[in-house]
Swiss-Prot record:
Domain statement: The presence of a 'disulfide through disulfide knot' structurally defines this protein as a knottin. The cysteine framework is VI/VII (C-C-CC-C-C).
Region ranges (Disordered): 19-41
Keyword Cell membrane: no
Keyword annotations of the record: Cleavage on pair of basic residues, Disulfide bond, Knottin, Secreted, Signal, Toxin
Record-given protein name: Conotoxin AbVIK
One Pfam family hit: Conotoxin
Superkingdom of this protein's organism: Eukaryota
Protein family according to the UniProt entry: Belongs to the conotoxin O1 superfamily.
Propeptide: 18-40
Tissue-by-tissue expression: Expressed by the venom duct.
Signal peptide: 1-17
Chief localisation class: secreted
Species per Swiss-Prot/TrEMBL record: Conus abbreviatus
Disulfide bond positions: C43-C57, C50-C61, C56-C68
Length: 74
C-alpha cells in the first residue's frame, strides 16, 4: 500500500511539473516575440517624411513641415 501511495504522489508531481513548464514556455515565446518586434522597428532619419505615427531616430517630427528634425535649443 505504501509503494502505491508513493507512486501515485510521484505521478501527481510529474504531471503538475509538466503542465506548469508548458505554461512558462508559452510566456517565454511571447517575450521573445516582443523583444524581436522591438528590435525590428525602424525609425526615420533626419529630413525624412513623418507624421503622428512615425518614429524619428532620436529626433522629433515637425508636423508643420512633416519632416524629422533635431530639436534646437536656445
Amino acid at each position: 500500500v505504501l509503494i502505491i501511495a508513493v507512486l501515485f504522489l510521484t505521478a501527481c508531481q510529474l504531471t503538475t511539473a509538466e503542465t506548469s513548464s508548458r505554461g512558462k514556455q508559452k510566456h517565454r515565446a511571447l517575450r521573445s516575440t516582443d523583444k524581436n518586434s522591438r528590435m525590428t522597428k525602424r525609425c526615420t532619419p533626419a529630413g525624412g517624411a513623418c507624421d503622428a505615427t512615425t518614429e524619428c531616430c532620436i529626433l522629433f517630427c515637425n508636423l508643420a513641415t512633416k519632416k524629422c528634425q533635431v530639436p534646437t535649443f536656445p
